[in-house]
From Swiss-Prot:
Changing R7A: Loss of membrane disruption activity against bacterial mimetic membranes (DMPC:DMPG) and strong increase in amyloid fibril formation. Displays a significant increase in amyloid fibril formation. The lineage of its organism: Eukaryota, Metazoa, Chordata, Craniata, Vertebrata. Monomer and homodimer. Assembles into amyloid fibrils. Under lipid-free conditions, mostly forms fibrils with a cross-beta architecture, consisting of stacks of monomeric amphipathic beta-helices arranged in an antiparallel manner. In the presence of bacteria or membrane lipids, fibrils switch to a cross-alpha conformation which may correlate with its antibacterial activity. Keywords: Amidation, Amphibian defense peptide, Antibiotic, Antimicrobial, Membrane, Secreted, Target cell membrane, Target membrane. Expressed by the skin dorsal glands. It is found in: Secreted; Target cell membrane. This is Uperin-3.5. It comes from Uperoleia mjobergii. GO terms for molecular function: protein homodimerization activity.
Length: 17
């Protein structure tokens, strides 16, 4: 769902930072 996409996006952002 949308929540899963948001969590995945947050994980990717944390990996980049």
């Amino acid at each position: 769902g949308v929540g899963d996409l948001i969590r995945k996006a947050v994980s990717v952002i944390k990996n980049i930072v």
